[in-house]
Curated annotation (Swiss-Prot):
Highest taxon of the lineage: Bacteria
All ranges on the Cytoplasmic side of the membrane: 1-2, 65-102
Description of what induces expression: Induced by heat shock, via RpoH.
Name of the protein in its database record: Lipopolysaccharide assembly protein A
GO cellular-component term (any): plasma membrane
Family that this chain belongs to: Belongs to the LapA family.
Keywords, ordered alphabetically: Cell inner membrane, Cell membrane, Coiled coil, Membrane, Stress response, Transmembrane, Transmembrane helix
Annotated membrane topology: Multi-pass membrane protein
Biological role: Involved in the assembly of lipopolysaccharide (LPS).
Periplasmic side: 24-43
Length: 102
């Protein structure tokens, strides 16, 4: 449910940016690192929003992957430690009373 709400929020922002850009058909000069270009506002908004969205997903995906690898490593370590512990607990301890009943 949470992901559906996030998706709908992102979709609403994208639709609003395209709608606002479509109503403003004027050309703007966009200065980027190596050059500059004349673009329509709608195109510029859509491209920049999509690029930001993709970069955000990439960064979040890398963090998620790092957490999953760390979790898998920890689970393997837990399993290995449990396997080391289980042979020691398999030996049954028989209580021995030192006092002999007569």
């Amino acid at each position: 449910m949470k992901y559906l709400l996030i998706f709908l929020l992102v979709l609403a922002i994208f639709v609003i940016s395209v709608t606002l850009g479509a109503q403003n058909d004027q050309q703007v000069t966009f200065n980027y690192l190596l050059a500059q270009g004349e673009y329509r506002i709608s195109t510029l908004l859509a491209v920049l929003f999509a690029a930001g969205f993709a970069i955000g997903w990439l960064i979040c995906g890398l963090f998620w992957l790092r957490v999953r690898v760390s979790l898998a490593r920890a689970e393997r370590k837990i399993k290995r430690l449990e396997n080391q512990l289980s042979p020691a607990t398999d030996v049954a301890v028989v209580p021995h009373s030192s006092a002999a009943k007569e």
